């Protein structure tokens, strides 16, 4: 922030205050302080954060904002007292007429031989601040183990449920409105899986360039793990017949656990995809895992990429929508499988990020009904040290420098990580 701007801090408008809050990564205060001027801002005290609405914004009782305000006051004080000082002291000696009419005699106030006034200024120095967005890779590794465990459990559950699926000759497919209006397209499911792999690849590239990749990947693992855990439950409690007569399910093994283990390992190695030839079991219908990944990757891509890349968002949205439509067009899932998968995925993503972006929702209270979800304690553990909304910041994670092609831009969020 420039010195001229600091000099006028007391004259800041509410808009300038909001800009300062955004520049210092404190967007959560923009709404409660929307009518505050610069003078109101620097007059905030600890007592103000014990009363609404400020008491509901942050769990640190506004300490970070107060520290930033103290720094602001210090910079403002130094700027305001810079001019007219010599080495930090104001010269206040005055010339008085000498007996011969000249002005060579100086009055030395306070008895100081150099004519300077000794002034004591108390400037509170904020304590060294830890990162607002700590990486905490250990927590990320735990979240990864959780997601991996849920994925393995899902493959085990698919193998178990496969043994319970009734033969299509005994129990024909259930009626489905979409199937009544659209004939089956054989190659449609391959398009679905190709779109899914493209979205996962785009998300992986985007993740590599994210500055706060540890926090964001931790959120991804927590959400996708929970979604697959829910899927284990829904698959097990209700076994639906195959959606179409075209299904050729693997033979039942009737308790041969060694063969089942080999089949589970094959499914894990192939990523649970039909296009890799690893998934030829039946019964994993309610709800659709393909819909989960198509929806979740799009949501993360859009949430953690710049808003100006609207064309990128539309491309990813189109890949997701076409992929989901092709699931139904291939008659590989009932419509209810897709609807339930979309609903659960979007709700869990939005709930988790709403709670993560609001400090007050990270504290359990009678007013916070979201604290009653079963995964609230793990959520608190993973998110308690993340202060505020994670910026959509990017960096260059590789040792070689960025190659700029064409004209240079004035500003970019993509910088070298030095």
From Swiss-Prot:
GO BP, one annotated term: apoptotic process
Catalytic residues (positions): 290, 333, 337
Function in brief: Major sphingomyelin synthase at the Golgi apparatus. Catalyzes the reversible transfer of phosphocholine moiety in sphingomyelin biosynthesis: in the forward reaction transfers phosphocholine head group of phosphatidylcholine (PC) on to ceramide (CER) to form ceramide phosphocholine (sphingomyelin, SM) and diacylglycerol (DAG) as by-product, and in the reverse reaction transfers phosphocholine from SM to DAG to form PC and CER. The direction of the reaction depends on the levels of CER and DAG in Golgi membranes.
Membrane-spanning segments: 141-161, 189-209, 220-240, 281-301, 309-329, 335-352
Keyword Transmembrane: yes
UniProt-recorded name of the protein: Phosphatidylcholine:ceramide cholinephosphotransferase 1
Tissue: Widely expressed. Highest expression in the cardiovascular system.
Enzyme Commission identifier(s): 2.7.8.27
Family to which this protein belongs: Belongs to the sphingomyelin synthase family.
Entry GO terms, CC: endoplasmic reticulum membrane; Golgi membrane; Golgi trans cisterna; plasma membrane
